[in-house]
Curated annotation (Swiss-Prot):
Organism: Rhodopseudomonas palustris (strain BisB5)
Catalytic activity entry: an S-(2-hydroxyacyl)glutathione + H2O = a 2-hydroxy carboxylate + glutathione + H(+)
Any one Gene Ontology molecular-function term assigned to this protein's record: metal ion binding
The protein, known as: Hydroxyacylglutathione hydrolase
Complexes and interactors: Monomer.
Required cofactor names: Zn(2+)
Pathway info: Secondary metabolite metabolism; methylglyoxal degradation; (R)-lactate from methylglyoxal: step 2/2
Protein keywords: Hydrolase, Metal-binding, Zinc
Family: Belongs to the metallo-beta-lactamase superfamily. Glyoxalase II family.
Amino acid sequence: MAADIRIVPCLTDNFGYLIHDPSSGATASIDAPEAAPLIAALEKEGWKLTDILVTHHHGDHVGGVAELKKKYQCRVVAPHDANAKIADIDLRVEEGDVVRVGGLSARVLETPGHTLDHISYVFDDDRALFAADTLFSIGCGRVFEGTYPMMWESLLKLRELPDDFKLYCGHEYTASNVKFALTIEPDNAALQARAKQVEQQRAAGQPTIPVTLGEEKQANLFLRADVPSVAAAVGLPGESAADVFGELRERKNNS
């Protein structure tokens, strides 16, 4: 039976996510930006939280962990080298590990760059990628702890997933990401189409997530740093994809 996924807006622009296995009743929260909205969503659905799958240590992703752990006695899964900012870790995971949530299986990918401990969770059977702050729709996370080549390699790892996977990212940044991307690739038809879709979604008060990886591969600049036209657009024809990515990220930082 397919997983049920709920998007739970948290804080100012964070996404919390609940993924539920109808067969076993198990439910995981992907990160826990704050407890109250997640508790409300769980109670609305009649679900009991069994697991929290943490992607990285930033406070806007783990701020609700301690309260949820206390209330539900749930298991906290976190990156193997996560620091002390994450409370009460029960299981540390690394590349290639598989985390089971009832009958659901999540494969762990190490995706460092935004932070050194960042991981993503891949639910292959449910065609769902929870990439937190590594990959956004039409964007990517700032590189706080890693390097640009490191972040580029992480994005390449996610780009290898099939086109039909749906991306669930950490923040609602899509509108601003689209605005920036159009300054680099104004003639990208896939980006233009996504821009119209995002405008309609935001006007209706709807989230811009999920989106398929196939769409992102066509429209997201940060997944296309190895495309010659993108390199040329930032004045780096013939340079390495990592250097082009770094230039894109610097420009986005200053936009």
